[in-house]
Amino acid sequence: MWTFTQKAPPLSTPSRCGAVAPVSQPIAGLLKLDFRDSGEFVAHPEVSTMACVAQPAAPLSIGSLTLTSPVVLAPMAGVTNVAFRTLCREQEREKMGSVSGLYVCEMVTARALVERNEKTLHMTTFAPDENPRSLQLYTTDPHWTYEAAKMIVDENLADHIDMNFGCPVPKVTRRGGGSALPYKRKLFGNIVAAAVRAAEGTDIPVTVKFRVGIDDAHKTHLDAGRIAAAEGAAAVALHARTAAQRYSGKANWSEIARLKEHMADSGIPVLGNGDIFAASDAAAMMDQTGCDGVVVGRGCLGRPWLFAELAAQLTGRPLPPQPTLGEVTRIIQRHAELLAAHHGEEHGCRELRKHVSWYLRGFPVGGDMRRDLARVSTLTHLADILAPFSDSPALADDADGARGRQGSPGKVVLPEGWLDDPEDDTVPEGADIMHSGG
């Protein structure tokens, strides 16, 4: 496997596809390398339809949990609710015969959970057969962290606790939360330690997700990984962008390799996140960085079947066939039914609208259908709109690539004086008084 540093990599390397290629050439059409002026290699995947059968990846162990496929669904506000997670799991089971990955609930605020905010409790809904149940906490305060994690343990609310230190949204960072917080090393360590202490003596692992740093001048991921491991985290996951990048440009996978190398003696897995839009991307990331698993976010928007493809790619099995438009219409209808069961029919249909453009990307459907779906209000109305396409054998054209929000890089909004003292463990004022879900 390649580890990208400031030095050039070796002349050749085995890929997860079993090929050996010189570094100046793409591996099996899946990989290209850019060389920045700074002297840093940035590796990233190219879109490819090639169904490479991978050398099987090792199962991923996160504390007491073992995942046959080292794949995690990233928490996404307003997306990874019980309806979407159920749909992803159904697709994996239907196409691969079992559910092998970890599907994480959308982020909830620790304080809102402890105070039993109605919206927050609704967001923590899990399906009866969902196992393991994974819940992500947003927190900036060790006190609320401990209380929330203890509540999860005492009330059997989840089997896994993840912690969000990766959100780059200005309304979060301006209060010292999300991707701003790991800069405060002592406070960060206190928060992780609080969650681990609350889960002590149980089978509930605590994991931590963070970014490369605030910006290129304030990278925090190496310290964050070391501190998280020292405080008892069972795994860490790195989104290979800074907060300043938000979701723009390309993720710098070489930073995942740096973190993996930095944490080689920690004994805990390092997962990579950023720009996984196809199954081949996951294999490429693991090959290039040596990471132990992948976390997938925007790439699955409108593609809940992606997790079946990822499971196939990373366990050495043939990829399932690409779904036709007819099959996708049935998946859309199922998604709507699940949303209606969770939110009620009217609210559920409104929630579906934002998924429509993602589902239909690359398919030959007219503007009329897209407009009708953007106004859908009942399940019957939805079925009527989809019916003319239910037998369509059409396949999506060029459906891979970036999905969801991308935007532009920008200056990170921080509390006044935030960068003055990284050892300051003062809890930022008012940061935990937020609605769950971002």
Regions found by a protein language model. Give the residues of each.
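Alpha/beta catalytic cores of nucleotide-metabolism and tRNA/nucleoside-modifying enzymes
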Residues: 2, 30-35, 42-67, 71, ...
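Hydrophobic faces of well-ordered beta-strands that scaffold small-molecule active sites
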Residues: 71-74, 103-105, 133-137, 161, ...
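Active-site beta-loop-alpha junctions enriched in small/polar residues
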Residues: 76-78, 108-110, 138-140, 166-168, ...
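Alpha/beta enzyme core
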Residues: 150-161, 165-175, 186-268
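A structural motif
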Residues: 93, 100, 157-158, 233, ...
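Glycine-rich, positively charged N-terminal anion/phosphate-binding segment
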Residues: 51-61, 76-155
